[in-house]
């Protein structure tokens, strides 16, 4: 019970910090994403990558891709947030064939505001769900080769039974 209370307080704190994110972002392909508008249309899940070449992070994206048909029924869209450089993140996008926007977190500004900094060049791998006020409504922090957080994500999205 104490763990749940602590997680709840952390989520409230993170949500407060995330309110400073811009309504509009640009992805690595130069496309503009109106995040404010997007969150009113769909559930927005942000997948953070430790680095563009993080194999566990790439596997997380591939796991989501393998179950995309089931996820599409959940009215969810994804954004991938990672440190640069852009060309390395472009390689990760091509490798995973993930059809959603990849965003370079310049100077790790967004990750820093979410307290997701491992060091000055890496982001803590996580999954975040945003609400229409651009606040973090749900978060799953951390990922490793044995644990991806998929069951929690699917439960939150009400898309259980996909794994």
How would you name each of these model-derived features?
Residues 2-11:
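Sec-dependent signal peptide recognition
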Residues 38-64:
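Short active-site neighborhood of thiol/selenol oxidoreductases, capturing the structured segment around
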Residues 24-44:
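A short beta-strand-turn-helix
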Residues 36, 114, 138-140:
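Short hydrophobic alpha-helix segments
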Residues 58-97, 108-112:
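Structural microenvironment flanking redox-active thiols in thiol-disulfide oxidoreductases
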Residues 11-19:
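Hydrophobic h-region of N-terminal signal peptides that target proteins for export
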Residues 98-100, 116-128:
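Structural micro-motif
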């Amino acid at each position: 019970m104490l763990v749940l209370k602590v997680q709840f307080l952390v989520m409230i704190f993170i949500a407060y910090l995330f309110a400073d994110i811009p309504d509009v972002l640009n992805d690595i392909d130069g496309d503009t994403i109106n995040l404010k508008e997007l969150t009113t249309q769909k559930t927005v899940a942000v997948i953070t990558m430790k680095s563009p070449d993080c194999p566990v992070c790439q596997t997380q994206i591939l796991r989501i891709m393998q179950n995309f048909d089931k996820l599409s029924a959940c009215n969810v869209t994804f954004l991938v947030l990672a440190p640069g450089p852009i060309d390395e993140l472009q390689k990760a996008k091509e490798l995973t064939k993930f059809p959603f926007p990849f965003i370079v977190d310049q100077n790790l500004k967004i990750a820093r505001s979410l307290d997701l900094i491992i060091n000055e060049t890496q982001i803590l791998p996580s999954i975040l769900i945003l609400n229409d006020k651009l606040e973090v409504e749900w978060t799953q922090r951390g990922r490793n080769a044995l644990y991806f957080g998929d069951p929690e994500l699917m439960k939150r999205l009400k898309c259980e039974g996909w794994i």
